[in-house]
Amino acid sequence: MTDTPFHCGFVAIVGRPNVGKSTLMNHLIGQKISITSKKSQTTRHRVTGIHTEDAAQFVFVDTPGFQTYHKGALNEALNKSVKDSLGSVDCVLFLLEAMRFTAADREVMALLPKKTPVILVVNKLDKAKDKLTLQAFIDEVTAEFEFAGVEVVSAKHGQRLAELLDQVRPHLPESMPLYPEDMITDKNERFLAAEIVREKLFRYLGEELPYEMNVEVEMFEMDGALRRIHIAVLVDKEHQKPIVIGRGGEKLKKISTEARLDMEKLFDGKVFLQVWVKVKSGWADDVRFLREFGLD
């Protein structure tokens, strides 16, 4: 009896902002590593999530939402990240919100590779009132691009994800696993700590959050079993600092507390976290800063 061949490959998750890409990846790997928010382009780095099973390893790449509304070096770098991801994967998941096929979706569709299998993933299936309406929507989309497959899911509730993996699996090349079977991301704890703080900023500041905002880990040290982490929130202008800090420091305190609790859960250990805000004018349009933050 011959052994079942192992398959391993890279899968890009692409779509317009706020369509559920990060939520989908978090559910596919069974762990929250990519931050989620209603604000566009929450994901600013290509985050890799790994799902391993008996005969296959899926390496998912969560990309920033492609959009042209914001201008400047930061947005150009994020859009470039999407394009680069599409050129180096074995399969692409093109994520759409059910019953919404917008100009922004078509912009992403125009980037889809012709020689790499692309699976249409229709998310938020509860948006469709019945199966006939949903099928008509799918027919409209598939008339504009030749997809390798179609799957309807609910990323938020983790529904039909096994069926989605079944569609992806045949497109993975025969290969030994690239990562240990218990590894869920190639990002280190320093990166994940920064992402957790960014998520809390999005959650507590909402529409007040400056687009030109980033976080920088200034210290990450192990003190026995304790992680000591110092993180600076970077804003572009002085008047943006009070937005993040809040009256009497209340917002920043909530952000820091919730971030620390999430880190302790993810890292399975105690964390001492300090977060503060500082101005770094022009960073979002300075290619040197973007390169420093890995956003070039």
Swiss-Prot record:
Region feature G2, mapped onto this chain: 41-45
Residues in KH type-2 domain copies: 205-281
Biological classification of the source: Bacteria, Pseudomonadati, Pseudomonadota, Betaproteobacteria, Neisseriales
Bilayer topology term: Peripheral membrane protein
Keywords (A to Z) from UniProt: Cell inner membrane, Cell membrane, Cytoplasm, GTP-binding, Membrane, Nucleotide-binding, Ribosome biogenesis, RNA-binding, rRNA-binding
Domain Era-type G: 7-174
Sample GO molecular function, one term: ribosomal small subunit binding
Name of encoding gene: era
Region G3: start-end pairs: 62-65
UniProt cross-references to InterPro entries, sorted A to Z: G_ERA_dom, GTP-bd, GTPase_Era-like, KH_dom-like_a/b, KH_dom_type_2, KH_sf_prok-type, P-loop_NTPase, Small_GTP-bd
Function as written in the Swiss-Prot or TrEMBL entry: An essential GTPase that binds both GDP and GTP, with rapid nucleotide exchange. Plays a role in 16S rRNA processing and 30S ribosomal subunit biogenesis and possibly also in cell cycle regulation and energy metabolism.
Protein name per Swiss-Prot or TrEMBL: GTPase Era
Family matches, as Pfam families: KH_2, MMR_HSR1
Subunit structure comment from the entry: Monomer.
HAMAP family in the cross-refs: GTPase_Era
Biological process annotations from GO: ribosomal small subunit assembly
Source organism of the structure: Chromobacterium violaceum (strain ATCC 12472 / DSM 30191 / JCM 1249 / CCUG 213 / NBRC 12614 / NCIMB 9131 / NCTC 9757 / MK)
Chain positions covered by the region annotation G5: 153-155
GO cellular component term of the entry, any: plasma membrane
Region (G1), start-end ranges: 15-22
Disulfides per UniProt: none
